[in-house]
Amino acid sequence: MNNKHPKNKAKSTTTPKTIALNKRARHEYHLIERHEAGLELQGWEVKAIRAGRANLGDGYAYVRDGEIFLIGAQITPLIQASTHVVANDRRTRKLLLHRHQIDTLIGRVQREGFTLVPTAMYWSKNRVKMEIALAKGKQAHDKRHAEKEREWQRDKQRIMRAHNRNA
């Protein structure tokens, strides 16, 4: 009896697979609120993303004509990308959100002076999604304070590990 679908088979989890992270965003901004957005991509961009050629380091989102666009994020084209299409690796890409989300984000950016920063790009159900965050820029003293806090947390962990080993 060859059973193709065993009952005790572990169910697959639908955890999103991370493509790219913007680690610099946490260092340079206070991240207030996060939102998931789709991306309007061309075919060569999806192939390049599958090959792991995305970089969010210099990216940010801006508002134009009631829509939100991503600028500065780099998707490096593959060598075998189509020859009849000019591949611009830093082109402006439209972010896909619901109208009420767009209105909320636009209001907070214009009234309260927030910035929209991409923090992560990942796969969700075979679609590329981007996590964007409402953010406020950090001052130099904020960055120093955050670095001191991280160092203290590392030292604390080191001390606890040494103490637990000796106990």
From Swiss-Prot:
Its main location: cytoplasm. Keywords: Cytoplasm, RNA-binding. GO terms for cellular component: cytosol. NCBIfam families: PRK05422.1, smpB. This is SsrA-binding protein. The keyword Chaperone does not apply. It is found in: Cytoplasm. Gene3D superfamilies: 2.40.280.10. Required for rescue of stalled ribosomes mediated by trans-translation. Binds to transfer-messenger RNA (tmRNA), required for stable association of tmRNA with ribosomes. tmRNA and SmpB together mimic tRNA shape, replacing the anticodon stem-loop with SmpB. tmRNA is encoded by the ssrA gene; the 2 termini fold to resemble tRNA(Ala) and it encodes a 'tag peptide', a short internal open reading frame. During trans-translation Ala-aminoacylated tmRNA acts like a tRNA, entering the A-site of stalled ribosomes, displacing the stalled mRNA. GO terms for biological process: trans-translation. Residues 144-158 have a biased composition (Basic and acidic residues). GO terms for molecular function: RNA binding. Residues 139-167 are annotated as: Disordered. PANTHER family: SSRA-BINDING PROTEIN, TMRNA-BINDING COMPONENT OF TRANS-TRANSLATION TAGGING COMPLEX. It comes from the Bacteria. Belongs to the SmpB family.
